[in-house]
Structure formats: C-alpha cells, structure tokens
C-alpha cells in the first residue's frame, strides 16, 4: 500500500491520474495521509474507477454535487465510478488517515458485458443518483462489511495468491450491496 500526500490530474482535466494502475491488474491500494495534503483537502476530481475506502483514524468530509457526508474513524464507503468529489480532513485532534481500494469494475466483473457485470455491477455504476454509498458502525450488515473492508487492507501483496484473495474479498463486499 502506497502512502499518498497529493493528487495528480490528467493535463487539462479534473480526472485523477492513478500512478501504478495497470491493465493486467486494474487496482491500487493507497493510504491517504490527508493532513499532509496542501490545505488538508483533496480538490474536486473524478475517476472512472470505483473508490472503496475505510477511515483508519480521524474524520473526513466527502463533498459531491449531491451533498456532503461526514465519515469518522471506523466508517467507510464507496464512491461510484465517474462521480465528481472532494474530501477534506476534519479532525484536528488525531491524524486523518483514509485507506483506499481504487479499482476498475473489470476486476470484479471479469470481461466487459459479462453476466456478472450486467446483473450486479452495471445497475450500480450506471445509476447517476448513486454518488456515495456510506457504511457506518451501528448497522449489523454495514458493520460486517466494514470488518471485511478493514481486514482487506491487512492482506499482504507479497503473499502468494494475493490478487486472488483480494478480488475474492472485494467480491464478497460487493455482494453485500
């Protein structure tokens, strides 16, 4: 997992450039140290990929065209594909650290046009009203997903079978939606 302190854009665009994102495994894991970003925020941006995140510590605010959501430590969520969003660190008492899985839906769905994509993935990623799906402790089903999410960041990329284990974990979480 790579520690990140800034965001990069494609030239002339608000589309985020995702360093290390490869076609043969369309996924990156990041540990965003939001207190180290200029102004303690990530400016407006978007990406074709899905963003699945967990708040390790602190709290952040997600802004989208549809509104604002606050995510304290222990919560998480999904930012849908192609959603314009920004985040800002809120906590001033502890570090604001966000763990992120950023991936192309093909990682879960397989080949474009597959039955899995059509039946389970496309209805979510093509729904413009779904910008962010929040996950908070206190709801049994959401807590189950949050535990899987937190555990998914402890998988070691050096371990044999990492890619298979990670994809299976992401699929298990996606199935819960």
Spans of model-derived segments:
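Amphipathic, well-ordered alpha-helical segments in soluble domains
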Residues: 51-54, 117, 144, 148, ...
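A hydrophobic/aromatic-rich effector-binding and dimerization subdomain
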Residues: 2-10, 17-24, 83-151
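Residues at helix-coil transition
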Residues: 57, 126, 154-157
């Amino acid at each position: 997992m790579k520690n990140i302190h800034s965001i990069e854009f494609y030239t002339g665009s608000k589309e985020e450039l995702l360093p290390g994102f490869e076609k043969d495994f369309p996924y990156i894991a990041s540990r965003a140290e939001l207190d180290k970003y200029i102004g303690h925020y990530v400016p407006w941006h978007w990406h074709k990929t899905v963003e699945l995140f967990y708040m390790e510590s602190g709290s952040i605010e997600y802004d989208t065209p549809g509104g604002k959501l606050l995510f304290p430590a222990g919560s998480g969520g999904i930012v849908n594909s192609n959603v314009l969003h920004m985040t800002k660190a809120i906590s001033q008492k502890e570090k604001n650290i966000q763990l992120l899985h950023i991936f192309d839906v093909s990682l879960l769905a397989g080949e474009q046009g597959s039955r899995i994509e059509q039946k389970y993935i496309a209805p979510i990623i093509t729904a413009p009203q779904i910008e962010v799906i929040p996950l908070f402790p206190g709801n049994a089903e959401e807590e189950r997903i949050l535990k899987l999410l937190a555990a998914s960041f402890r998988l070691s990329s050096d371990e044999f079978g990492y890619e298979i284990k990670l994809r299976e974990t992401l699929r298990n979480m996606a199935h819960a939606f």
